[in-house]
C-alpha cells in the first residue's frame, strides 16, 4: 500500500496530480497549500464528489480471491478575503482513508477481515500576505469513523462480527507561498504529525512536508510540479482486535512522492493532465503510479464546472520461495470526480 495518504482532494486537484499548490485556481487550494489562498481576490466556494473504486486480486498459496470496493467521497472548500492582507479559508475533505479486505490465510489469518478507517478533516486556515510572500496557519480537526468486520466460516456456515465506532484528534500545518515573478511561484507546507484513538483503534498520522512549483509557460499554459516527504515509518492505524498480518495499515518506511501536471486554456475550456509516483510504505516497497486527465468549462465568469479521471497502477506485491509464488497481491484503482467552483 502507498499508505493512508489520500491525495484526491478535489476534482481540480486530482486532474493536476495535486501538484498545483503554488498556483490557486479555486478554494480547493486549501487542501494543498493554504498560504496560496492569498492569490484569490474574491470569495470563492468549491465542491466536489469523487466516486472511487479499488480492485484487489489475491493469490495466496495458489488460491485466488478478488475484491472490489467503491466509495463516494464529497469535499467542500470556502475562501474569503478579510482585507488586502488577511484571508480566511475553511476546508472539509478527506486526506487520510483506507478500505481494505484481507482474505483468509491458512494458519496465519483464519478470519476474512475488512477494515475501513475513513478520516474527515475540518480545517480552518488564516493567511497573511506581505508583498509577494504569504504565510498561513491551519488547524485540523480529524473525525474518524471506523469499522472492523471479521468473518469466520466452517464448511458452508459463516458468521460475521462487526465493530464500529468513532474517534477524533487534532493536527495543524504551517505554509508559505512566494510569487517570484508574474509567471513563477512556489509554496511550501509542513503538516504536523497527529496521534489519537480509543480502546478499539489507535491512529498515528505522519508529518508531511510538501514543496510546490508553478511555471506559466505562456499566458494560457501552466506547468506544475511537487515533491512530498511523509514520515510514515511506524505510523498508521492499529486495531486492538486485528493483527494486520500483511502489514497494510502500518508503515515500515517513509514515503516520497513526486508529481507533475500541465493545464492549457482554450477559450472557456481548461484541459488538464498529470502523473504522480508514490513510494509504497509496506515491507516490499515499490512505486505506485497514478495517471490523470481533467477538463474544466467556464459556464459564466463566476461559475466553472470540472471533471477528472484517475487511473491507479499499484506496485505488485509478491512473496517467493524458490520458483514458487507464495503470496501475490495486485491493486488497481479508478476514480471519477465531478465538481465546480463559484466566485462571488
Regions found by a protein language model. Give the residues of each.
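Surface-exposed strand-loop-strand hairpins of Gram-negative outer-membrane beta-barrel proteins
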Residues: 18-25, 53-70
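Outer-membrane beta-barrel pore proteins
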Residues: 20-25, 30-43, 78-84
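A broadly conserved detector of short glycine/acidic/proline-rich loop/turn motifs that flank catalytic sites
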Residues: 20, 51, 309-311
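Outer-membrane beta-barrel porins/channels
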Residues: 2-14, 60-61, 70-344
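Transmembrane beta-strand segments of Gram-negative outer membrane beta-barrel proteins
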Residues: 5-18, 38-55
Amino acid at each position: 500500500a502507498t499508505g493512508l495518504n489520500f491525495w484526491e482532494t478535489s476534482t481540480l486537484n486530482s486532474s493536476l496530480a495535486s501538484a498545483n499548490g503554488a498556483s490557486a485556481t479555486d478554494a480547493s487550494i486549501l487542501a494543498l497549500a493554504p498560504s496560496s489562498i492569498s492569490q484569490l481576490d474574491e470569495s470563492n466556494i468549491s465542491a466536489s464528489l469523487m466516486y472511487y473504486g479499488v480492485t484487489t486480486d489475491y493469490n495466496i498459496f495458489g488460491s485466488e480471491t478478488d475484491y472490489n470496493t467503491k466509495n463516494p467521497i464529497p469535499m467542500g472548500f470556502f475562501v474569503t478575503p478579510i482585507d488586502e492582507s488577511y484571508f480566511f479559508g475553511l476546508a472539509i475533505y478527506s486526506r487520510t482513508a483506507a478500505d481494505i479486505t484481507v482474505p483468509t490465510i491458512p494458519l496465519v489469518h483464519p478470519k476474512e477481515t475488512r477494515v475501513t478507517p475513513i478520516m474527515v478533516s475540518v480545517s480552518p486556515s488564516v493567511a497573511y500576505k506581505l508583498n509577494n510572500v504569504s504565510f498561513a496557519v491551519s488547524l485540523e480537526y480529524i473525525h474518524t469513523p471506523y469499522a472492523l468486520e471479521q468473518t469466520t466460516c466452517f464448511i458452508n456456515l459463516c458468521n460475521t462480527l462487526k465493530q464500529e465506532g468513532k474517534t477524533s484528534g487534532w493536527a495543524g500545518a504551517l505554509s508559505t507561498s512566494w510569487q517570484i515573478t508574474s509567471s513563477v511561484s512556489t509554496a511550501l507546507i509542513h503538516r504536523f504529525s497527529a496521534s489519537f484513538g480509543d480502546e478499539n483503534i489507535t491512529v498515528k498520522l505522519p508529518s508531511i512536508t510538501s514543496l510546490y512549483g508553478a511555471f506559466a509557460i505562456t499566458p494560457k499554459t501552466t506547468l506544475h510540479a511537487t515533491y512530498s516527504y511523509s514520515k510514515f515509518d511506524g505510523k498508521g492505524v492499529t486495531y486492538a482486535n486485528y493483527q494486520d498480518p500483511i502489514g497494510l495499515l502500518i508503515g515500515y518506511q517513509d514515503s516520497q512522492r513526486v508529481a507533475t501536471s500541465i493545464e492549457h486554456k482554450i477559450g472557456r475550456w481548461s484541459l488538464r493532465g498529470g502523473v504522480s509516483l508514490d513510494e509504497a510504505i509496506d515491507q516490499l516497497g515499490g512505486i505506485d503510479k497514478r495517471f490523470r486527465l481533467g477538463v474544466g468549462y467556464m459556464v459564466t465568469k463566476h461559475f466553472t464546472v470540472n471533471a477528472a479521471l484517475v487511473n491507479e497502477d499499484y506496485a505488485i506485491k509478491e512473496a517467493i520461495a524458490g520458483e514458487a509464488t507464495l503470496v501475490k497481491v495486485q491493486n488497481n484503482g479508478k476514480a471519477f470526480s465531478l465538481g465546480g467552483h463559484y466566485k462571488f
